[in-house]
């Protein structure tokens, strides 16, 4: 049996692919790889696309040194810096997304975490949003303990977002101010608190293909069911400002291999979609079945109406 077909059958039976198999898949025939990744997606998930959106609820002045991030105080970028937004501003954006048919909405805040008065304010925000709107609520507030996560859940949050960013082996090349294990612990805390978890990473940081495969396997081991894949936007003033953008083929290969390794998960297009033709049309044919829509934290995304049109044009549907 052809290797890619053999791996598809293994994936559909939920038998765990090895890193060696993942690497061989990455280097296999592109057309066949994409076709079978798409077949895995169809067989397990059907043709539905999950849409989520975010708001940059607190921007800049972050004390962490993540090499890719425009919000780090270690970088000189031209982003807007502001404290936690007021509730009405956040509610307005959440309501606009709900009215457009977006499934999930998350407040994202800069910094290692959110503490004290700001954390209590955001708990009130979620509680009010949960009462006033129907959109599913997600949260992204950095490294956090289980007690705080339980508070988020009680306030109506269903899912916590916390990316691993890259492999354990590569992590200290992009961040020195906190450890990979702290990120893993946050994910475990969220699961123990009864929250769903959204966690993925960024490709194009200078990592190897093996690093990407190791990330996909770690996410599988953590049983993550929503995996955002960001493609680095090299922002002027950051440590990675001179990184050469990935080409579309490499991005599609990565998405497809993530689908093989994580057949049950939603593979979510996130930052850097502008690097793909028509904001990722081919990615939805390579195993992706979810996307962040609208603007991101410090970069522009695709408009919701344009994403809805794109999804319709490729014969898929928003569920």
Swiss-Prot record:
EC nos: 2.8.1.6
Cofactor: [4Fe-4S] cluster; [2Fe-2S] cluster
Quaternary data: Homodimer.
Gene that this sequence comes from: bioB
Keywords on record: 2Fe-2S, 4Fe-4S, Biotin biosynthesis, Iron, Iron-sulfur, Metal-binding, S-adenosyl-L-methionine, Transferase
Binding site for [4Fe-4S] cluster: 62, 66, 69
Residues spanning the signal sequence: none
Highest taxon of source: Bacteria
Protein name, per record: Biotin synthase
InterPro entries membership: Aldolase_TIM, BATS_dom, Biotin_synth/BioAB, Biotin_synthase, Elp3/MiaA/NifB-like_rSAM, rSAM
The family this protein is said to belong to: Belongs to the radical SAM superfamily. Biotin synthase family.
PANTHER family tied to this protein: BIOTIN SYNTHASE, BIOTIN SYNTHASE, MITOCHONDRIAL
Binding site residues for [2Fe-2S] cluster: 106, 138, 198, 268
Residue intervals passing through the bilayer: none
GO molecular function: 2 iron, 2 sulfur cluster binding; 4 iron, 4 sulfur cluster binding; biotin synthase activity; iron ion binding
Catalytic reaction annotation: (4R,5S)-dethiobiotin + (sulfur carrier)-SH + 2 reduced [2Fe-2S]-[ferredoxin] + 2 S-adenosyl-L-methionine = (sulfur carrier)-H + biotin + 2 5'-deoxyadenosine + 2 L-methionine + 2 oxidized [2Fe-2S]-[ferredoxin]
Pathway membership, UniProt: Cofactor biosynthesis; biotin biosynthesis; biotin from 7,8-diaminononanoate: step 2/2
């Amino acid at each position: 049996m052809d290797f890619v077909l053999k791996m598809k059958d293994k994936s559909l039976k939920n038998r765990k692919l090895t890193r060696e198999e993942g690497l061989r898949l990455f280097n296999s025939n592109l057309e066949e790889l994409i076709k079978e990744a798409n077949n895995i997606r169809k067989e397990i998930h059907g043709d539905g696309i999950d849409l989520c959106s975010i708001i940059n609820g607190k921007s800049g002045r972050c004390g962490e040194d993540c090499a890719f991030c425009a919000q780090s105080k270690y970088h000189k970028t031209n982003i807007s810096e502001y404290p936690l937004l007021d509730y009405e501003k956040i509610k307005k954006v959440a309501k606009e997304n709900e009215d457009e048919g977006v499934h999930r909405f998350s407040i994202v805040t800069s910094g290692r975490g959110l503490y004290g008065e700001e954390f209590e304010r955001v708990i009130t925000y979620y509680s009010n949003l949960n009462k006033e709107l129907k959109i599913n609520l997600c949260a992204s507030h950095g490294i956090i303990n289980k007690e705080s996560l339980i508070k988020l859940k009680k306030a109506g949050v269903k899912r916590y977002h916390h990316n691993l960013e890259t492999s354990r082996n590569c992590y200290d090349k992009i961040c020195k101010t906190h450890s990979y294990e702290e990120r893993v612990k946050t994910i475990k805390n969220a699961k123990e608190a009864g929250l769903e978890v959204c966690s993925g990473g960024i490709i194009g940081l200078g990592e190897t293909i093996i690093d990407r495969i190791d990330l996909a396997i770690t996410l599988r081991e953590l049983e993550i069911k929503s995996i955002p894949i960001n493609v680095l936007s090299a922002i002027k003033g950051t440590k990675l400002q001179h990184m050469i953008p990935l080409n579309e083929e490499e991005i599609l290969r990565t998405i497809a291999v993530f689908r093989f390794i994580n057949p049950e998960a939603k593979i979510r297009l996130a930052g850097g979609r502008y690097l793909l033709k028509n904001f990722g049309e081919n990615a939805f044919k390579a195993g992706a079945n979810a996307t962040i829509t609208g603007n991101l934290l410090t970069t522009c995304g695709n408009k919701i109406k344009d994403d809805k049109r794109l999804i319709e044009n490729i014969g898929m549907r928003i569920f």
